[in-house]
């Protein structure tokens, strides 16, 4: 038997060992989209695959994603082009903004939702194909956009009833030159204690030393207590920017914790970074994360240009976040479960010999009532159809037998009470007679 590939899961109409029912996904997505609409953000739909160099340049060659987690291959062109299933959405969104000149005279605020792909060890809430909501705001260097995005996520948590189970952690990475100075000081400090670092941190010391700050190894974390602090290397502008963000968050009533070791796993961030974390899923888990990436647009614009022309490329400010929907749905179901929705409101049961009349009735009802979901079973026995009606979750079952067709009536059964009455054939066509 052919099965789905490890880490690539079906999302069905029923719960499985690896996924919640599709009806819960739809409700979750609808609630998130409502908040996005309220803030005036617009949807974009991006390709699943991009050129590999886009992610290598944007995310960083030394990151875990590029080094170990990307699904990459070549296409059939001549010469072949290296392409990659997208491991995240920001790089593709920035590519689209550049390619279509969306920044010309505008400051677009965009969102996208869909599958991402990373070659990781599958575990609960973390799969090789997973789903993200990504939100990006372009063209503003002001801290108010960062506060707006955090306020948006906070509103989403409130609507989902999980705001008390999430904690906001924030930090400032400063500008590139400030981060480089800190990087040098951190490496110099850790080189003297290299043998005490865990194996992964020893490797990162030469490839991506800032990621050592995010190590989960307790001995490494103990060493970092004595290490230089990034905050001590921030210039006045970066410090003022961060203080303004904290002022805005306080005014919004959003509690936060400054985490000096929060650096994020992608190279393109500068200044503000943030994460929403929870311990409700076992060990502390990140549900949503983001930050500012003012240099990424210029970096991607310069691809293929000479060194002199690349230096002349103007970058644009940008900030965004992404949230993993599998993990978010797990949290929602643990704290404030989404109520399962039935597949239909009205189930039409019809004598097998009268199936054409049943089809016509169901279709006329759908045309008259766009608010109703009307379902029919195949032309099996009445008994078999009634069993399906019982399982459907419908509020009403409409029964069409020979007597009803001849008299122009229908039998309407209220499913939760079992009461069954005869009504005019067009009774359900009027919202005055039956409302959801």
UniProtKB/Swiss-Prot annotation:
Its main location: cytoplasm. Signal peptide: none annotated. CDD domains: HisRS-like_core. Disulfide bonds: none annotated. It holds the Pfam family tRNA-synt_His. GO terms for biological process: histidyl-tRNA aminoacylation. Its EC number is 6.1.1.21. The keyword Aminoacyl-tRNA synthetase applies. The keyword Transmembrane does not apply. Keywords: Aminoacyl-tRNA synthetase, ATP-binding, Cytoplasm, Ligase, Nucleotide-binding, Protein biosynthesis. InterPro entries: aa-tRNA-synth_II, aa-tRNA-synth_II/BPL/LPL, Anticodon-bd, Anticodon-bd_dom_sf, His-tRNA-ligase, HisRS-like_core, HisRS/HisZ. One of its GO terms (molecular function) is histidine-tRNA ligase activity. It is an enzyme of class 6 (ligase). It catalyses: tRNA(His) + L-histidine + ATP = L-histidyl-tRNA(His) + AMP + diphosphate + H(+). One of its GO terms (cellular component) is cytoplasm. It is found in: Cytoplasm. Belongs to the class-II aminoacyl-tRNA synthetase family. Homodimer. This is Histidine--tRNA ligase. It comes from Psychrobacter sp. (strain PRwf-1). The lineage of its organism: Bacteria, Pseudomonadati, Pseudomonadota, Gammaproteobacteria, Moraxellales. The gene is hisS.
């Amino acid at each position: 038997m052919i099965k789905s590939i490890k880490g690539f899961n079906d999302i069905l109409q029923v719960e499985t060992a690896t996924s919640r029912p599709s009806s819960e996904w739809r409700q979750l997505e609808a609630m998130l989209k409502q908040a996005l609409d309220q803030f005036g953000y617009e949807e974009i739909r991006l390709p699943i695959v991009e050129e590999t160099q886009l992610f290598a340049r944007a995310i960083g060659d030394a990151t875990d994603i590029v080094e170990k987690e990307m699904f990459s291959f070549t296409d059939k062109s001549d010469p072949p082009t290296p392409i990659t299933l997208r491991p995240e959405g920001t790089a593709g969104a920035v590519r689209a903004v550049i390619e279509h000149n969306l920044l010309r005279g505008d400051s677009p605020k965009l969102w996208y939702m869909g599958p991402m792909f990373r070659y990781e060890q599958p575990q609960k809430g973390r799969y090789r194909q997973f789903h993200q909501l990504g939100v990006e705001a372009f063209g503003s260097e002001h801290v108010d956009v960062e506060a707006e995005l955090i306020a948006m996520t906070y509103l989403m948590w409130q609507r989902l009833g999980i705001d008390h189970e999430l904690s906001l952690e924030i930090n400032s990475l400063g500008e590139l030159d400030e981060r480089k100075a800190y990087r040098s000081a951190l490496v110099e400090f850790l080189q003297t204690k290299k043998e005490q670092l865990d194996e992964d941190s020893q490797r990162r010391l030469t490839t991506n030393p800032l990621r050592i700050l995010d190590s989960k190894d307790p001995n490494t974390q103990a060493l970092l207590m004595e290490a230089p602090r990034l905050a001590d290397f921030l210039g006045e502008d970066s410090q003022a920017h961060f203080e303004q963000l904290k002022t805005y968050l306080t005014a919004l009533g959003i509690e936060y914790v400054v985490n000096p070791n929060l650096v994020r796993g992608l190279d393109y961030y500068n200044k503000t970074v943030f994460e929403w974390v929870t311990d409700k899923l076992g060990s502390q888990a990140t549900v949503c994360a983001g930050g500012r990436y003012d240099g990424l647009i210029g970096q991607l614009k310069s691809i293929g240009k000479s060194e002199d022309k690349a230096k002349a490329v103007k970058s644009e400010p940008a900030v965004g976040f992404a949230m993993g929907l599998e993990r978010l749905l797990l949290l929602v179901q643990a704290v404030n479960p989404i109520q399962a929705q039935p597949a239909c409101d009205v189930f039409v049961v019809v004598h097998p010999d009268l199936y054409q009349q049943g089809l016509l009735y169901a279709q006329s009802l759908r045309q008259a009532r766009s608010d109703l979901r009307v379902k029919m079973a195949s032309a099996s026995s009445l008994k078999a159809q009634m069993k399906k009606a019982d399982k459907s979750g419908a509020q009403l079952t409409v029964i069409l037998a020979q007597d009803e067709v001849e008299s122009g009536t229908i039998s309407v059964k209220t499913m939760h009470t079992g009461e069954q009455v005869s009504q005019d054939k067009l009774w359900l066509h009027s919202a005055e007679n039956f409302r959801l």
